Amino acid sequence: MIRPALRTDWTLEEARAIHALPFPELMHRAQTLHRAHFDPTAIETASLLSIKTGGCPEDCGYCSQSAHHDTGVKATKLMGTEEVLAAARRAKAAGAQRFCMGAAWRSPKDRDMDRLCDMVRGVADLGLETCMTLGMLSPGQVARLKAAGLDFYNHNIDTSPAYYARIASTRTMEDRLETVEQVRRGGIKVCCGGILGMGEAEEDRIALLVTLATLPAHPDSVPVNLWNEIEGVPVQGRAQAVDPFALVRIVALARILMPASVVRLSAGRTEMSDELQALCFLAGANSIFVGDQLLTTGNPAAWKDRDLLSRLGLHVAPARARPPVAAD
């Protein structure tokens, strides 16, 4: 199958028109492009661990880990390397191909970089792909993580540029985009997506994807999150459940605008029926988090995911070969 050239010049008008297509036509276009770039029966699996929880100085209105909100989440110190590696071994045994490590920071301190790099090297030595989400990074920190063997860096933009100011004030959309570009220029694969269900309009969801699809290069991985009900955060008062078909349309639009990117169903799968997840896979989603816990929210039990993939005739995608990491 011929793969159409990837575009980074999408317009909001084009995206609106695609999003509004009759459902069968939208699904057909998304599935056609999905098949051009991926095995449509293969699902990538990742596991996520909070290596430093709570006490974050940012005021993101959706987040239970912000120090600005009374959510009952207790701040912890950065975990030790051996504790992280033990969790990575469990994740691999449970079927994860990628191990993602998240810290609730505005940005990592230089004093923590040695330990973070040790974590990356240790996880890579287990044969897992490595991913981190640590907040904003300096060019020097990007270089150190790259040298340690970090495969992916997650830094979501959360929502549309127009709606962003209603979500956070301590970090701007421009800050987020600069971090994404910093990571890309440093040679680390970019994981960047957003969150649905925070009171945003349909237009904001479309604009979120257009923002990602018009970056200098598409993110390698695009996580699609549903906001989880969290007590004590500002978003709680205006959050609205996302219509199931609206979610599928967004997944399909992500696949069409960014056909070579992995599209991950991330937070919120506990609220999705098996039928909804199946439609999302048909629309082009091809990755999930496995394990009972994400950062501070739940996730479907491993047996449920195995059962769902089996019933759909899907399989876990084979792990990609990792390039050798140069010694320090």
Curated annotation (Swiss-Prot):
* Cofactor(s) required, per the database record: [4Fe-4S] cluster; [2Fe-2S] cluster
Where is [2Fe-2S] cluster annotated to bind? C100, C131, C191, R264
Q: Which UniProt keywords apply?
A: 2Fe-2S, 4Fe-4S, Biotin biosynthesis, Iron, Iron-sulfur, Metal-binding, S-adenosyl-L-methionine, Transferase
> For this protein, what reaction is catalysed?
(4R,5S)-dethiobiotin + (sulfur carrier)-SH + 2 reduced [2Fe-2S]-[ferredoxin] + 2 S-adenosyl-L-methionine = (sulfur carrier)-H + biotin + 2 5'-deoxyadenosine + 2 L-methionine + 2 oxidized [2Fe-2S]-[ferredoxin]
What InterPro entries does this protein map onto?
A: Aldolase_TIM (IPR013785), BATS_dom (IPR010722), Biotin_synth/BioAB (IPR002684), Biotin_synthase (IPR024177), Elp3/MiaA/NifB-like_rSAM (IPR006638), rSAM (IPR007197)
What does the entry's cofactor note say about binding and number? Answer: Binds 1 [4Fe-4S] cluster. The cluster is coordinated with 3 cysteines and an exchangeable S-adenosyl-L-methionine. Binds 1 [2Fe-2S] cluster. The cluster is coordinated with 3 cysteines and 1 arginine.
Question: One biological process GO term for this chain?
Answer: biotin biosynthetic process
Extract one GO molecular function annotation from the record: 2 iron, 2 sulfur cluster binding
Domain Radical SAM core: from-to ranges: 41-260
Query: In which residues is [4Fe-4S] cluster bound?
Result: C56, C60, C63
Q: In which pathway does it act?
A: Cofactor biosynthesis; biotin biosynthesis; biotin from 7,8-diaminononanoate: step 2/2
Q: Write the Enzyme Commission number(s) for this entry.
A: 2.8.1.6
- Which top EC class applies here? transferase
Annotated family: Belongs to the radical SAM superfamily. Biotin synthase family.
How does the annotation summarize its subunit structure?
Homodimer.
HAMAP family, sorted: BioB (MF_01694)
Purpose of the protein: Catalyzes the conversion of dethiobiotin (DTB) to biotin by the insertion of a sulfur atom into dethiobiotin via a radical-based mechanism.
The protein's name in its UniProt record: Biotin synthase
Q: Could you read off the lineage of the organism from its UniProt record?
A: Bacteria, Pseudomonadati, Pseudomonadota, Alphaproteobacteria, Rhodobacterales
